[in-house]
Amino acid sequence: TITQNTYLMRNLKELRIAVAGTGYVGLSIATLLSQRHKVTAVDVIADKVDRINRRESPIQDEYIERFLREKPLDLTATLDGEAAYRDADFVVIAAPTNYDPKKNFFDTSHVEEVIDLVLKVNPDAVMVIKSTVPVGYTASVRERFSYRERLADGTMKVVVPNIIFAPEFLRESKALYDNLYPSRIIVGYDRGDSALEEAAGTFAALIKEGSLKEDVPVLFMGSTEAEAVKLFANTYLALRVSYFNELDTYAEMKGLDTRSIIDGVCLDPRIGSHYNNPSFGYGGAALELGDVVDHL
């Protein structure tokens, strides 16, 4: 439960934000939010922390590199997650969740390590999972990390952690650009929790505040539906890449002009001319097609 001493009683401009992870997802959201808010980025790799504090990007992203170099960002990086989370209103979790072929599941252990530490040092903080996770994960992890607390009158109360889910729709090397010009903002939360509803609205406002695009569509839904949106979007993009690669393979085998076929197919407005250039196959930590389908 969110107490009266947290961000709900503060002006939007006074928020303190911690970001766990400084990969494409974490560093892009940290850069975006630090335009207007105090942001502390947490990582376990000292070299990445040092480079961020020197205003050098540890990842290849033109916009992140330029913003770190030229913008007056209120951004610091640290190895000390406990200190970063202790005073945070929001903790954005962008820890890696790569697919584990041995377990046949996403490895969410790093996400849970962050949740566990936040609950120890700042249980009132709102945690926002941006890592790719299985459908139903946010609801299950909230239940798993629930705990009993004794009230002043001696009665026991079940406390459910403040965790919401906000999927990312980013391209590597263009992560900050995609945050500055988002196609949509989606935030999922427990629809029966009015405090989390307000937290979801505040987080969406933070993202919208940092973006440069006007009239960004904002969708609120259950956390499980938001998780499904992320995985189904990934699945469609993977299918589309595979489709045009197969078209190209067929055309090459038959001695046909691939571009003519693609142009003719894609002029249908139901198909469109985006993501239609045959090349290498799809890839990325969150774009493992067979693995994604297994968890839908």
For the regions a protein language model found, what residue spans apply to each?
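Structural/interface elements that position substrates and couple domains in central-metabolism enzymes
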Residues: 3-296
